[in-house]
Amino acid sequence: MTLFIDGDALPNILKPILLRSVERLKIPTKVIANKKIHIGDSPCIEMIIVSQGADRADDMIIELLSPEDLVITADIPLADRVITAGGHAIDHRGTRYSSDNIKHYLAMRNLFESIRESGEITNGPKPFTQKDAHAFANQLSAFLQRLEKRKK
């Protein structure tokens, strides 16, 4: 399994959580973004910088993705592509996307996008909190524990 991190908008508070997991389990990790994102120093982490442009990082993740890989992203359309390709996706707030729920999240995202495009003023996402970081850490840990059990 490879861990992919969609580097766009990755909260800094998650970087040490990710680094600890990567180092503890020696998980091959690719951070993909259009600028350098420093997660931490580890031989397990590779930084891939893509050119500027819509969905360039997303396209690179999908190109490199294998079934069962895990992608960390807050990008719901990317999560949908990951699930469709047989991968797994967790967002920054600890939501684990699956084939059972991704279409719901995508529909909600598209609904709110169309409301915003119509000129309606909507609230943006809630500020990222320590509680969100904790939920993310728990979901990542649970996913990695299931993975370790399957290896045995």
UniProtKB/Swiss-Prot annotation:
InterPro entries: UPF0178 (IPR003791). It holds the Pfam family DUF188. Belongs to the UPF0178 family. This is UPF0178 protein NIS_0137. The lineage of its organism: Bacteria, Pseudomonadati, Campylobacterota, Epsilonproteobacteria, Nautiliales.
